Amino acid sequence: MTHPDIFNLHEDLLGDINKFHNKFGFKKSQKVGIPEDSELVNFRTSFLMEELAEYTQAITKKDDAAALDALIDIVYIALGTAWLFNLPFEKGWREVQKANMSKVRAKSKSKKRGTAFDVIKPKDWKAPN
């Protein structure tokens, strides 16, 4: 039995994204990849950056509700962008997850991002395809 708070990536997240974009008449690209339409690409990029700025403001204010809203919007926009660009999100997710799980926890602040909260690539790490 599935816990009611756990949702399915395909049915819930990707299904919701599909319904949303279809409702407003946004069309998925026929070809896979970043479209030639620079206006669309620039809009989606700016949209993500706007939400990241909102998240930063929420964290600064210690506003949990606004932080959660911004994080969900970031995921929504990122998934929507992948959907519009016809990118193979589920396959990509699995590949990135596999690569991420082969990383190791940083042991000191002297690592790449200067914090022991980070995870780093071991010497034999392989990037996702």
Model regions and ranges:
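Flexible "arm" and connector segments at domain edges
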Residues: 1-129
